[in-house]
């Protein structure tokens, strides 16, 4: 099986070659994520909400540990989104405990998991309920000209970056996409729910990245065209762009963006040349598109441009760059870093890593 690399799975950079190289995730504290949840919690109800800090632990394993400690089935443990294992992350979980007192969750805690806050609420935590994620990244072993770095950072703060799905979505060496293609060619869906979700997500993400890569290559990823479907940064609804909509000042303000397809049943609702491009993409991947439609996936949209909120940076040491920013839920910090620096594995200073 051939290993798929960064250009196979993502696409070209929008802002030119990387300004240099650095190491990310030398330790978990170098990649910190804080979930941003805009839900007022009532303090009462049959759902126990937990604000959890975890280190070197993925979200699914943390959920299993919390469920075991609470004595509840996994279906009664909820979280808004998956967070990286190789990171220090803080996120919410909820446990459904109707008629039960708060359980002793000490068995779930350890050096890699701490419960920072507990409160009650009337509803469970829904997937995708978080509004955003706040990131603090520490890039070490930095080799780059600071003047070039500062100029690039100012540029992406002003205009954003392509909203690619990150390499994490596709598994090691693109393995999730390889498996998705195999399932599509055989017209089957894995019985295991987690595998099914992982493969369907990889297939949709790849098609989106293909479309975005085309628009980055021609310089239209951040400009609206007649026939585009436009969406606001934090909205899942969209509307068709005519000539007047293409002149909307909110596009220049990075509040409104062109979108690309998350493939599902039926043709995309885009128009004009945009629809032609998206149908041509589907024609180049017929098995994958049929498979996604047959799986009952609804056709959705994702913004092509990723605005970076509150981007700040400094150099705590001569060879360390620290970044702080906020991204909408479902967006990848690594695609921001990719527009700035090449990442190299710990202990190396050559050859960009493939993850």
Curated annotation (Swiss-Prot):
InterPro entries: PsdUridine_synth_cat_dom_sf, PsdUridine_synth_TruD, PsdUridine_synth_TruD_CS, PsdUridine_synth_TruD_insert, TruD_catalytic, TruD_insert_sf, TruD_pseudoU_synthase. Gene3D superfamilies: TruD, catalytic domain, TruD, insertion domain. The keyword tRNA processing applies. The keyword tRNA processing applies. GO terms for molecular function: RNA binding; tRNA pseudouridine(13) synthase activity. It catalyses: uridine(13) in tRNA = pseudouridine(13) in tRNA. Responsible for synthesis of pseudouridine from uracil-13 in transfer RNAs. NCBIfam families: PRK00984.1-2. Belongs to the pseudouridine synthase TruD family. This is tRNA pseudouridine synthase D.
